[in-house]
Amino acid sequence: MDIKYNELVNQFAPGAKQITIKKIRKKGNGIFSLNRYTSGTVLLEVPLENIICRKTVEQFRNSCDKFASIATLEEWNDMSFRTQAMLFLCYLWLGIQPRTNKWDKFLTVLPLSINTPAQWPEKEVYSLQGTSIFNPVCVKRKILQQEWLSLNQRYSDSWPSKITLPKWVHADALFHSRCLESPFKDPVLAPVIDLCNHSSKSNAKWSFSEDAMQLYLDKDIDENEEVTINYGSEKGSAEFLFSYGFLPEPEGDRITNVMKLLIPEDSNDSLDLAKRRSCKTPPMIEFVSDSSGELWWHAPFLFFSVLNVEDFTNFKMVCDESKAQTVDWEFEGQKCSVEDLPKLVQLSPKRDLYILRVFCLAEQLADAALNTNIENMYNPTERRSESVELLKRESFLLKKVLLYLRDVISKLLKSKVVVEFIHSQTIES
């Protein structure tokens, strides 16, 4: 094992089992076992004072006046942990702190580049057109640039003004690609454990004891076998590329495929904007095909969107605290959140009619996404291999989704409730 990794393990995970760090082609580095170990074995423990979390960054702030000088304690506590961690990493990179601080060995093993699209050259970002992450990547790049400009303007006479835009973008990529969930309010960065690569057939997991973060096996492993964790079985190809900079390997002929699309504003619905203000987050539609091949989708807002005023028991426009118009509503005599509305619709006597409307709208959104996908797939523009592969995976998913949606629509059109409604509309017209 390279001496710098040996020193890293000894400092941050003292007492670790027999492991080594090796380079892996196209994957950077990975952790390998030097012995056979059984499921349940704790391979290593990182004491909580050796992980990067709010508490340890706060301790660093308390010990370093220059680092702390940019914000009062109240201002610091108002920052997200992401911002705190990025400032912490950037401060260490600037070399202001003497190279004897405890985090130096962690800093030396961090990758100099990560293949996340936010760090791609602008021309290559455009190769993502037609995929579900093209717009999110463009928005993220813009937000990172705005954050960096704000830092430079606000701290023009202090150390943050020395942070370059590439360093700020890289700090964000490091945070999102290496952070791990914790029982605390925020995720954490864990030296050594963060060297574990992803596998859908992982053999290890992490957990927390009272005073340490542990990496333990949940399968038996052989000598020289790589130790892997699962970055998220519910995450699809787009999210992996967006957050980690790579596309996950298929599981045989199966792969978890997820597409998340922003539901566009409906210019034909005068109540659309008011309905959207009832949502805590921008309304999305999510299509999923899991590793077993099972297909499902999720879009609670569509159930709200397809309801007309006369479909509600009560529906009135009101002003929220910012004096923006929103809606106060009840469906079949009950108040509920947009997220819970689908459950009420399922119990309605007019269920089939409402579900038909929802499926028709979902079909329109999937069809529009597929058309955009196909247009870009055959665009002669030179594309990165990751972009081409993501286009193919999302095209396959959308075609599968459309077959399912259209099959359900054809069945719903034969429903007694739907047939009677169509007949009543024909008579009225």
Swiss-Prot record:
One CC-aspect GO term: cytosol
Q: From which residue to which does the signal peptide run?
A: none
Superkingdom of the source? Eukaryota
Subcellular location per the Swiss-Prot or TrEMBL entry? Cytoplasm; Nucleus
- Supply one GO molecular-function term: protein-lysine N-methyltransferase activity
Q: What is its main location?
A: cytoplasm
Q: A GO biological process this protein is involved in? A: methylation
- What protein family is recorded? Belongs to the class V-like SAM-binding methyltransferase superfamily.
What is the protein's name according to its record?
Answer: SET domain-containing protein 8
| Native species | Schizosaccharomyces pombe (strain 972 / ATCC 24843)
